[in-house]
Amino acid sequence: MYLEHLHLHSFRNYAEQVLKFESKKTILLGNNAQGKSNLLEAIELLATLKSHRVSKDRDLVLESDSEARIFARVNRLYGASELSLILRSSGRRTVIRDRQPLRRHLDFLGVINAVQFSSLDLDLVRGGPEARRDWLDTLLIQLEPLYVHILQQYNQVLRQRNALLKEIRKQELEGKVYGDLSQLKLWDLQLAETGSRVTRRRARVLQRLIPLAQKWHESISGKTELLELQYIPNVPWVEDDVNGVQRAFLDKIETRRLAEKQLGTSVVGPHRDEVDFLINQNPAKSYGSQGQQRTLVLALKLAELQLLEQIIGEPPLLLLDDVLAELDIERQNQLLDAIEDRFQTLITTTHLSSFESRWLQSSQVFSVKKGHIFY
């Protein structure tokens, strides 16, 4: 997989920028707040239709405009493809593949695959469970584009069910009895159906990722530490069986019925899943040093790269955003050695001193200043 061409129009602080990539390794050099991360964010959007930095499209559009455009041409083993993404301040999006507008966003996904590694990824260990769920879901979207639809279905059911629970709670607080609970039973069934699809896929992808992450972690730590990853679904289940998982959902919903009515919200489902990271059987979040936490995240990212390559059949893009500054020299070398020329890599930095001369000689260096890129 090779990204040949990128064109940004009114995206973030880029009014108009065209880039042609002529090397497997591209270094984006510049001071902070010049637009280096914005460029990687544009590629991330093409790969996942998500930004890990903001949730509103209006934050992605240049202030003086009402819409932004991202265009890319990528070469893959099966041929070349062109992608266009139009973002509007209103929130409405248009996705275009090979000059054909698409009705379904999932038909846009999977053309570009990328792994992003930034200083924000340390929140995977330090932050709350939502960060770890988002990480897992972003990986799943690239491995199985249909998952974006599965996740949307679940979130829609969750919103509707929460609205009903809120109404039930409101009426009970007013001293009224909510008469017809059959509607809630219907939402229970839909939550179990859509939620089981989410949780089963999360469990499967983590099962494939764990041995890869453990191998990388062993290599980086010099076999001195044992990494464990544990998926803790909110609804525990034993066998990967559709009916069995759905029954487990309905059983737990029944046991938590009173709590849900009192709180006016759903307390059962994959929106409350957790992923635990353990180092030598101790929680990495509480007991891991900064160095151990960085080693863990580096191992996860290298495992993501490896898993994507195994499943899609070619190396994905690697986007490194100010990550070298977060790693010591030994871990920097581990990362750069793992990359070599295997993955097309875009890396942001404020200075070139972190790179060996052989890296610089084989890299294309762009200077970034106030939303302009100079060759």
Swiss-Prot record:
Keywords: ATP-binding, Cytoplasm, DNA damage, DNA repair, DNA replication, DNA-binding, Nucleotide-binding, SOS response. Its main location: cytoplasm. One of its GO terms (cellular component) is cytoplasm. GO terms for biological process: DNA replication; DNA synthesis involved in DNA repair; double-strand break repair; SOS response. One of its GO terms (molecular function) is ATP binding. ATP binds at G30, N31, N32, A33, Q34, G35, K36, S37. The RecF protein is involved in DNA metabolism; it is required for DNA replication and normal SOS inducibility. RecF binds preferentially to single-stranded, linear DNA. It also seems to bind ATP. PANTHER family: DNA REPLICATION AND REPAIR PROTEIN RECF (PTHR32182:SF0). This is DNA replication and repair protein RecF. It comes from Microcystis aeruginosa (strain NIES-843 / IAM M-2473).
